[in-house]
Every structure is written in C-alpha cells, then in structure tokens.
Amino acid sequence: MYAVIKTGGKQYKVAAGEKIKVEQIAAEVGQEIVIDQVLALGSGADLKIGTPLVEGATVTATVLAQGRHDKVRIFKMRRRKHYQKRQGHRQNFTELQISAVLG
C-alpha cells in the first residue's frame, strides 16, 4: 500500500519501510510522528483520491535525523559594470522512516 502525503508544501509518494527527506519538522530524533494530510491512497489497481484529503487516513513515521543539505551557491553578475554578488544557502531537512500507511 502506498500514499501520497503533503508536508512542507510538497507532495511525496511513500510506502511502508521507505526513507524520505522532507522539509524540517520540529521533532526529536527517534520520535514517532503522525502525518494526517494524505491526498491519495493506493494498492495495486485500487486507488482512493481525497477531496482534498482522504478521511481517516494517516501515515506514521519515525524521525531518523535532522540535518542540512549541501550548500547551494548563488552568483549574480552584471557584465561590464563590475558588479558581483555571491551568496550561499543550506536548507534544513528531516529524514523520516515510514512505519505504516493506515486508511
């Protein structure tokens, strides 16, 4: 069974046993969280699509790690004007282990 969940403004297709990296969630490492924003549920040819959410469906996950992605370098330049601007950004993430898909 798989589910399409929404967290951090993004959508992820998940199944039990998978590991995913999502936008940072305020939770401790080892803590179990419940995601109730399930947009769709499916198993084989059977698919249940929510309007916008599937009622009673939840996904439970365990927090494996809190971390930061690799640095993204931003470089702006105006030719012939001696203008250069450098900037870097590292986005925070939470790594989750999907325990169960219920619904």
Curated annotation (Swiss-Prot):
A GO MF term: rRNA binding
One Pfam family, short name: Ribosomal_L21p
Domain of life: Bacteria
An example Gene Ontology CC term for this record: ribonucleoprotein complex
UniProt KW keywords: Ribonucleoprotein, Ribosomal protein, RNA-binding, rRNA-binding
PROSITE patterns: RIBOSOMAL_L21
InterPro entries according to UniProt: bL21-like (IPR028909), bL21-like_sf (IPR036164), Ribosomal_bL21 (IPR001787), Ribosomal_bL21_CS (IPR018258)
GO biological process: translation
Cited NCBIfam families: L21
Subunit composition and interactions: Part of the 50S ribosomal subunit. Contacts protein L20.
Function: This protein binds to 23S rRNA in the presence of protein L20.
Family from the record: Belongs to the bacterial ribosomal protein bL21 family.
Name under which the protein is recorded: Large ribosomal subunit protein bL21
Species of provenance: Leptothrix cholodnii (strain ATCC 51168 / LMG 8142 / SP-6) (Leptothrix discophora (strain SP-6))
Name of the gene encoding the protein in the UniProt record: rplU
